Curated annotation (Swiss-Prot):
Disulfide bonds: none annotated. It catalyses: alpha-D-mannose 1-phosphate + GTP + H(+) = GDP-alpha-D-mannose + diphosphate. Belongs to the transferase hexapeptide repeat family. InterPro entries: GMPPB_C (IPR056729), Hexapep_transf_CS (IPR018357), Mannose-1P_guanyltransferase (IPR050486), NTP_transferase_dom (IPR005835), Nucleotide-diphossugar_trans (IPR029044). PROSITE patterns: HEXAPEP_TRANSFERASES (PS00101). The gene is gmppa-a. Pathway: Nucleotide-sugar biosynthesis; GDP-alpha-D-mannose biosynthesis; GDP-alpha-D-mannose from alpha-D-mannose 1-phosphate (GTP route): step 1/1. GO terms for cellular component: cytoplasm. This is Mannose-1-phosphate guanyltransferase alpha-A. GO terms for molecular function: GTP binding; mannose-1-phosphate guanylyltransferase (GTP) activity. One of its GO terms (biological process) is GDP-mannose biosynthetic process.
Length: 421
């Protein structure tokens, strides 16, 4: 029997995802038409003998989360539960805190994945690899290749070329260590908890030496820095390298890139989700997802990489490319939306142009990853995708370029390279 744990974080995390995370917990943000974490759940449901999925985070349980879990259980026919941490305990602290729930029923192994990654999730291949490399006494990290410069932004893995054993692990090193990076998806045997317990006891001893220490800090354990670095070179930790697409979803801009990766996967996994040009329907270019309840005028041109949410209205002559249009938004006649996320119930006026700058990886480098740009560079806003928060109104015939508009704003003129508070 197998289980899966998905680490979904909490409201204090994912701040780079604002203003989109104001309205909905980041793991429920729609990427390629379905909530981000649903891609993980679907991948888990395809693993034979996987009986339960546990979501661990420190969001307060709310209606959106509860109804999503209920729908997902019915759709994927697998038990799904949410376990709430009392505070942010780190990637290792969360699973250690809920170790009894994870181990109940006696799973032989369990997956642990971060909710903010986009991947093909080669879980069955990881399972086969795990059986060949030590089984119950070994642990597997999913790895991929990055270029030398960008590898410094991730956990770097030095592995034995023949056996794939992890010899050395460094989280975000200061200088180049390895071009194999950690994808944030793991397969553990239950014995991993012995190693996490060692870190817990070590934290306990260190805190006893400090006078004003808080007991909560004892439970804050990071898998990457505290556990993997000590397990490396001990014959227990292995890396399974994937050639498939992979990306982090840290900033709102990376959601558009992740949407592109998932839409391209739909060609083989869910062809029914992709729209096509039909007589009397809109012109579709490339991969496009349109929710069945959306109302799209036949003269509109959509794609590539466009995701249209529930109840969206796309009027005559509208052009949309490389964008996510969320629930209830209205795009009026002849508006143009490029490299933009249009928030829930927002309105783009007639002949208005809303455009951003894509933050894509370098297309000439096969190992390039998406850069997590800082919001400001040299005192100026870094050009990135345009984001309209929830319930934003853009008047007719204006241009909004490389800007972030916070929720409930009614704009009256054009803006360029600004954050509109």
């Amino acid at each position: 029997m197998l289980k899966a744990v998905i680490l979904i974080g909490g409201p204090q995390k994912g701040t780079r995802f604002r203003p989109l995370s104001f309205e909905v917990p980041k793991p429920l943000f729609p990427v390629a038409g379905v909530p981000m974490v649903q891609h993980h759940i679907e991948a888990c449901s395809k693993v034979p003998n996987l009986k339960e999925i546990l979501l661990i985070g420190f969001y307060q349980p709310n209606e959106a989360l509860n109804s999503f879990l209920l729908k997902a259980q019915q759709e994927f026919k697998v038990a799904i539960r949410y376990l709430q941490e009392y505070s942010a305990l780190g990637t290792g602290g969360g699973i250690y805190h809920f170790r009894d729930q994870i181990l109940s029923g006696g799973p032989q192994a369990f997956f642990v994945m971060n909710a903010d990654v986009c991947s093909e999730f080669p879980l069955v291949s990881m399972l086969d690899f795990h059986k060949q490399h030590g089984g119950s006494q070994s642990y597997v990290i999913l790895g991929t290749t990055a270029n030398r410069t960008q590898s410094l932004n991730y956990g770097c893995i030095v592995a034995n070329r023949d056996t794939q054993e992890v010899l050395h692990y460094v989280e975000k090193p200061g200088t180049f260590v390895s071009d194999i990076i950690n994808c944030g998806i793991y397969l553990f045997s239950p014995s991993i908890f012995q190693h996490i317990a060692e870190v817990f006891q070590q934290n306990q001893q260190e805190l006893q030496l400090e006078e004003n220490s808080s007991w909560q800090r004892m439970e804050v354990i990071r898998l990457e820095q505290d556990v993997f670095s000590t397990l490396a070179g001990r014959g227990k930790l292995y890396v399974y390298k994937t050639e498939g697409c992979w990306s982090q979803i840290k900033s709102a801009g990376s959601a558009i890139y992740a949407s592109r990766l998932y839409l391209s996967q739909y060609g083989t996994t869910h062809p029914e989700r992709l729209a096509s040009t039909k007589e009397g329907g809109p012109t579709i270019r490339g991969n496009v997802y349109i929710h069945p309840t959306a109302n799209v005028d036949p003269s509109a041109v959509l794609g590539p990489n466009v995701s249209i949410g529930m109840g969206v209205t796309v009027a005559a002559g509208v052009r949309i490319r490389e964008s996510i249009i969320l629930h209830g938004a209205v795009l009026q006649d002849h508006s143009c939306v490029l490299n933009t996320i249009v928030g829930w119930d927002s309105m783009v006026g007639r002949w208005a142009r809303v455009e951003g700058t894509p933050s894509d990886p370098n297309p000439n480098d096969p190992y390039s990853k998406i850069d997590s740009e800082t919001l400001f560079r040299d005192g100026k806003l870094t050009p990135s995708i345009t984001i309209l928060g929830c319930n934003v109104s853009i008047p007719a015939e204006v241009v909004i370029l490389n800007s972030i508009v916070l929720p409930h704003k009614e704009l009256s003129r054009s803006f360029k390279n600004q954050i509109i508070l």
